[in-house]
Amino acid sequence: MTRITIVTDAWHPQVNGVVRSIENTNTELARLGVDVRMVTPQSFYSIPCPTYPEIRLSVAGYRRVAAEIEKSQPSFVHIATEGPLGFMARRWCVKNRMRFSTSYHTRFPEYVAARFPVPESWLYAFVRWFHNGGNTCMVATPSLETELEARGVRNLKRWSRGIDAELFHPRPKAKLPFELPRPIFMTVGRVAVEKNLPEFLDLDLPGSKVVIGDGPARHELQEKYPDVRFTGVKTGEDLADAYAQADVFVFPSKTDTFGNTILEALASGVPVAAFPVTGPIDILGGNPAAGALDDNLRDACLAALHCSPQAALTLSRSYSWEKASRQFLDNVIHAAGKSLPLLSRSQLA
């Protein structure tokens, strides 16, 4: 059996799109007969990330990480993140002449520059070095592919995302969800500086605003915006029920590479309001009935109130984890060349 080892610095108990994407892809790959082994911070001593303690950073040395990779006996290695584990895994692959792929999930340069006085140009030089060492770099959207290409990243392949339609779907709407008056403008995700939440929370909108999620900026924002309902983290059925109560899903981030929460909202029959940037523009562009894109976020929110819940649901059905995972596997086959004799495109039929 073909064995793919995925190395990631992002893993449980983190709650984010990277973790969900890897988790759902693993499930689908297993159905395709691929044995996936994980190398995550859970196997090593880790410390809280400065300014973001919810994220744990592994401090294991190269030999310890190398031993963990070798224990998994990989046919191929996929490196999902550019953190300490990803860095060590890249070193191991180069040293052992193991072909490998990477993926660009997070705007690493922007996130670091928002917290520390490091020039983005230096950080993008690292991104180029890191990803160009592999045989394929996977990206979620056409606009991100164009952007990274312009920054000198090579061998780019598309790996889209999916949605759990059994969990996220339209549900009956309560008259006063969260005991708040409608319309409900909702956002879901990490409550952190890079998510640009004040752009949403400062808006003069009818009805109520709800923020679902947690993160390092929550306490500060909760004090600054007492009229906004902060619920904390919700998962599973609780999260799906919450999505379905929204009238408009607001996605204020300008730094995401995709936006899994956009798909979750659309699948719940909730139109989306966002800026016309990478992620939202790739999902909603050409689908004005399902949501609104505008450089003025307030205008987008008000326009989305008149969009179609059915159009939102229909758009979400063009995404599935099965389709995305087959795309991932096809990229692995391409990157591996002849080094995966037991894995062929016949498995994708």
Regions of interest found by a model, annotated:
Residues 125-171:
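Donor nucleotide-sugar binding/catalytic pocket of nucleotide-sugar-dependent glycosyltransferases
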Residues 177-210:
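Conserved donor-binding/catalytic core segment of Leloir-type glycosyltransferases
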Residues 219-238:
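Nucleotide-activated donor-binding/catalytic signature segment of Leloir-type glycosyltransferases, i.e.
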Residues 233, 241-246, 328:
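Short alpha-helical donor nucleotide-sugar binding micro-motif in glycosyltransferases
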Residues 254:
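Aromatic "clamp/platform" in nucleotide-sugar-dependent glycosyltransferases that forms part
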Residues 271-274:
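Short hydrophobic beta-strand element within catalytic cores of glycosyltransferases
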Residues 306-341:
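A charged, aromatic-enriched C-terminal amphipathic alpha-helix characteristic of glycosyltransferases
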